[in-house]
């Protein structure tokens, strides 16, 4: 466990954190940050990248002459073990990595589907969402996935992409990793109820945003998606598909490929 403590934290005072840390019986390390309270600490995030270097990478029994297929496991903020599918071009060259998130109620995309990005010279790091997690846990898992992807030696930078819930997580990951995420694409992001924070994350984006909206979506209503898109002040573009519901849109996926790789 890597444990960080802001010495000016009044929400969870250092003395309270002492008890938690002292009760840990596993291998552990603690870092103190004078002058920081209960807030995000960039220096600690940077330490996490090194900490995640030990994330196990297991080869898969699938291969092609141009791509390597692997499963990466890493630890979530709450201690749970998370898994991601990782596909990268053969070799040790550092390449842009598509940080991919899937929708609620749908599985992670198939290996061969994601290989399309390898043809463009990109890697793919696709998180397998926890089925029963609440919104805040899902947001935290997205950040953990971004850190794990960044810890891989062949990652140059990140491109966030997702549909539905995945679109929301892509926007959140891009907002929280502005120095590493260079583009973000989201289709029908969930943006009401527990996911209303999506608009706040959109307002923090500095990378270009591509957004797709289904005109008949009742799960992520177009009016709610308007709030998300309007909140973004970055370079942005949106496509509206009037006759579609909350479903996969092949035409938008073509737009995503062109957005990520302008030569497509």
Task: Specify the residue positions occupied by each region the protein language model found.
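Short glycine-enriched nucleophile-adjacent loop
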Residues: 20, 167-179
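Short beta-strand element of the alpha/beta-hydrolase
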Residues: 94-103
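Short amphipathic alpha-helix adjacent to the substrate-entry channel of hydrolases
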Residues: 109-127
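Alpha/beta-hydrolase active-site loop
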Residues: 133-152
């Amino acid at each position: 466990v890597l444990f960080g403590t802001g010495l000016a934290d009044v929400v969870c005072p250092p003395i309270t954190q002492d008890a938690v840390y002292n009760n840990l019986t596993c291998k552990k390390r603690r870092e103190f940050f004078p002058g920081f309270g209960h807030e995000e600490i960039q220096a600690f995030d940077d330490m996490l990248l090194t900490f995640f270097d030990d994330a196990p990478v297991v080869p898969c029994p699938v291969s092609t002459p141009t791509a390597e297929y692997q499963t990466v496991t890493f630890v979530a903020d709450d201690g749970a073990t998370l898994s991601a599918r990782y596909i990268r071009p053969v070799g040790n060259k550092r390449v842009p990595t598509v940080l991919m998130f899937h929708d609620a109620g749908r599985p992670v995309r198939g290996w061969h589907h994601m290989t399309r990005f390898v043809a463009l010279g990109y890697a793919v790091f696709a998180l397998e969402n926890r089925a029963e997690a609440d919104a805040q846990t899902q947001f935290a898992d997205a950040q953990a996935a971004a850190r794990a992807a960044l810890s891989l030696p062949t990652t140059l930078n990140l491109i966030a992409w997702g549909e539905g819930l995945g679109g929301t997580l892509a926007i959140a990951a891009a907002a929280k990793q502005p120095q590493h995420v260079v583009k973000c694409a989201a289709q029908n992001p969930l943006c009401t109820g527990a996911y209303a924070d999506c608009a706040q994350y959109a307002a923090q984006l500095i990378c270009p945003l591509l957004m797709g909206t289904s005109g008949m979506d009742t799960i992520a209503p177009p009016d709610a998606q308007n709030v998300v898109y309007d909140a973004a002040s970055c370079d942005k573009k949106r496509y509206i598909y009037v006759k579609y519901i909350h479903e996969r849109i092949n035409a938008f996926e073509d737009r995503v490929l062109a957005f990520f790789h302008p030569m497509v």
